[in-house]
Amino acid sequence: MSRSFMIILTIMLIALSLGEVLAAENGYDLIIVRNDDLIDYLIALPYSHLLDIPILPVNPKELDDVTKAQLYSYIQLGRDKILIIGNNNAVSLNVEKELEDMGFKVTRIGGADRTETAEKLALHFYPNGSKLVILASAWDYGSTLAASEFAMEYKCPILLTWENQLSPSALEGIKKLNPKIVILVGFGINETVEKTIEDMGYETYWIGRDIEPPPIETTTTTTPNQTSSSKSFFLGVLVTLMILSPVIVYLWKKREERRSQFLEQFSEKEIEVLRAIIENGGEIKQEELPKIVGYSRPTISRIIQDLEKKGIVEREKSGKTFIVRVIKKIKLD
């Protein structure tokens, strides 16, 4: 019996028992996310769908008059419990205070970065764990959008990871959720991430590489009303994405400009050395670099010292050599 068949069979058995998954009690009437970055909106979608509550993207610094008018109308209907997704840098304390002054009861769930925010949300809404976990790259918005759709369909949490290695938050989330299978989505994840998960003892299934879509079936029968509700929900998602798209395009261009300016500080040789380290999972023995990039040991030593001064890498003594580790998130391509 092939490994692929066993994985498919396991996923189908998990899907049949998804109704046993217990989410946190529905204590919210509205989810608030920032309107200048799509990632928090995407990781909020599965929980919005799970609890059947809307998401409102807002200015992260302060509430404008139109948003306040919407919120006043909402609270007058008795819906006064708000969940803010993201830390104070994502949605400011000023916005939180404005909401409280309007009479809302505010809860905030956020981490140091988007991977930790995703972990905290997953553990909050699935305190008893989940037999299925969706994993996507924190920097590949397309894959995260697809991952959110799968998480909504299968009623399971979503975690985010770094591209070249499993993020500490995703690792902890997987351990605490203790799933039967971790489903990886998209091409923005390195195979070292999958290997790390498998070495932890979990089955993996890679949508976009193994089978697309996965053969997962649920026992829930969709009624006409459910179908209509689902269509309305996804229409709302589509409209929101259309509204946000000009902002996203602008931010993407600005990000690319900043990235280009950032990369200009590095020489061609420094970029080659950085690429070699990143492709090795973010750290490597210094003695291995000359063979990989083709530069002499003195040249490698000088490059590493320069990268240390720029705060990009750090070195740790290991026997007669050094372990060189990338300490700053950097995207070369």
Curated annotation (Swiss-Prot):
This is Uncharacterized protein PYRAB14350. Residues 1-23 form the signal peptide. The chain crosses the membrane at residues 232-252. It holds the Pfam family CW_binding_2. It comes from Pyrococcus abyssi (strain GE5 / Orsay). It comes from the Archaea. Keywords: Membrane, Signal, Transmembrane, Transmembrane helix. GO terms for cellular component: membrane. The keyword Transmembrane applies. PANTHER family: AMIDASE ENHANCER, N-ACETYLMURAMOYL-L-ALANINE AMIDASE-RELATED. Gene3D superfamilies: Winged helix-like DNA-binding domain superfamily/Winged helix DNA-binding domain (1.10.10.10). The keyword Nucleotidyltransferase does not apply.
